[in-house]
Amino acid sequence: MTIAITGATGQLGRLVVAQLRAKAPSKPLVALVRSPAKAAVLGIPAREADYARPETLVGALAGIATLLLISSSEVGQRAIQHRNVIQAAKQAGVKRIVYTSLLHADTSPLSLAPEHRETESMLKAAGIPFTLLRNGWYTENYTGSVAGAVAGGAFIGSAGEGRISSATRADYAEAAAVVLTSAGHDGKTYELAGDEAYTLTDLAAEISRQSGKSIPYKNLPEADYAATLAGFGLPVGLAQAIAGWDVSASKGALFDDSRQLSKLIGRPTTPLATTVTAALG
């Protein structure tokens, strides 16, 4: 029963492939990617499958029993692209779809949520057994800024004292691998988040502790934070989106205390301190 992974060369996808190879070495795997040549490093067969080119999808999904649909990286195009994949999966006879959605997608104020809600609705209407992995925030979304914070003397954001229950990509990848290789998940929705909730003030304190430098958290108004990010060279639209996500975090959008992720993977999620250590190198 072959498992296919979309976006298999991406930051999450490659970790899922590694987990699957470790957990179920005899399980047939297929990487679905835009450029099969770039997937050679994964060590599994690869097929061309471009979300935006429906003509590539049905053939790519031939003979696939279980599909991991990793959400598209193209925000604003996700719903259309996901529809292409779901329709192709139905046509190809895929038996099961596992989808990486967003934490509390049905109620989340995050600007990312509507496309995930729409995709979830498509899956429910498709008639294919499915599982929703509602992934919370990646800790790396914040620790990617650690080096810059140390260099600049402050960690900046707009999340206020919002509590963030993030987990690492590796944690979410392991959860996906568990669901893909075990039974009893059809029709289930998992709200996945880290065990440890923290504020950006807490994150700044941890950076200070590990770096030996005083790195305070500086909370900025949304517009000021967006302007600062744009000043660092980010596209204006992306800068505004990131600032908006932080504001949503200040309202609780990134918090969850159900510990469904650690229950699913059978271990605690990766501590914030561990990810900060990795970021400091």
For each feature predicted by the language model, list its residue ranges.
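A hydrophobic C-terminal alpha-helical subdomain
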Residues: 223-281
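Residue-level recognition of oxygen-bearing side chains
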Residues: 38, 56, 66, 260, ...
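Acyl-donor (CoA/ACP) binding surface of acyl/acetyltransferases
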Residues: 45
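Periplasmic-binding protein-like
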Residues: 68-70
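Cofactor-binding loops of NAD(P)H-dependent oxidoreductases
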Residues: 49
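Oxidoreductase cofactor-interface core, primarily capturing Rossmann-like NAD(P)-dependent enzymes
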Residues: 2-37, 42, 52-64, 73-83, ...
